[in-house]
Amino acid sequence: EEAEYLSGELYKLGMTVFPSQANYLFFEGEPDLYEKLLQEGVMIRDCSNYPGLWKGCYRIAVKLHTENEQLLEKIRKVRR
């Protein structure tokens, strides 16, 4: 349930979210999203060093609703 919520919110923010059966989401966003979130004290997994992937590919864990909301708020903040 929480994975669907988080995926939907990322999609609303213009991110490409890939289907997942695991407790994390893989998505494509802005190439500098990792650096911007890091400045806000939030670390997401930059997947650009995975074979075949590029800058702007990320992975995040699906957590409790309040934690997912905090992450989404930080993403919204750095994208303003």
Per-range role (PLM):
Residues 39-40, 49-80:
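PLP-dependent enzyme catalytic core of the Aspartate aminotransferase-like
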